[in-house]
Amino acid sequence: MSKYELDVVVDGFHYLEGPRWYKNALWFVDFYNKGVYRVNDEGVAEKIVHVEQQPSGLGWLPDSRMLVVSMKDRKVLCLEDNGELVVHADIWKHCEGHANDMVVAPNGNAYVGNFGFDLMGGADHKHTGLVLVRPDGTSQVVAEGLAFPNGMVISADEKTLIVNELFGNKVSQFDIKENGTLGEKRDFANFGELGDEPNLGVRIENASILPDGLALDSEGAVWIADTLNQRAVRIKEGGEILETVDTAPDGIFAVALGGQDGKTLFMCAAPDWNEASRTAETKGRMLSTPVKVGHAGTP
């Protein structure tokens, strides 16, 4: 495996998530600054919009309007051309916990995950689903039985959705039907079934990987943020680990492929994901390293 040198892109944040490379710029959110940011040509992160109920997943409609998940009120918001942030979809009834990550397909269909339970409040783990939000703002549940669906990507041919199951010890995938709904879930990479165990501590103890953020490359492999082991790993379908980027003592919580040639791996780093600690400190930062295989698919 290659040796990776890490660069710091930006630092001094609370907890970064949702990295995206869009229109030749790096975008991301800070949960606890409650902002969506874009890194400008001078390498400075500019706050684009404030999301009071905590921003998460990002994406763009075909007309270039930005969508952002508002976590705590379980909405998808749209940044209009005039700078107004409006409700694109209210998905409260479809979520059993905070709304979280999102991927927006080239046709404008958005797929949104949610926690499934009160993670920060210490509740028992419960499986949950994925919500499809159409360009007109209508929504429906299109998958169920996922263990904290998190990072998602859509293949370059727009026929497959791949999703991390953070507390499921696996990466799953679905066929995308012509109407935007999803087929049956199947494994992309499974590191051992954890079943219906409700105790989150036991699930984590029995897991070998905690797959958070996700990025797809042109060879069909995925980079994932492995929050359990302070690393980003490149995995081929079937579960073989091809490359490892060690980031200790930082944990990695989201990843993206970008840069002008699509061969820069961006990694959202922080000491942990504890809400109280990350709110109180500004140790969150964005790391990067060059990789050999470039970006594919969406985002």
Model-derived features: positions:
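A short loop-to-beta-strand structural motif that recurs across blades of beta-propeller domains
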Residues: 35-37, 75-77, 128-131, 170-172, ...
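Flexible "stalk/tail and boundary" regions
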Residues: 23, 39-41, 46, 62-63, ...
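Beta-rich, blade/repeat-based domains predominating
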Residues: 10-24, 51-70, 75, 93-110, ...
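Beta-propeller fold detector
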Residues: 7, 46-50, 86-90, 140-144, ...
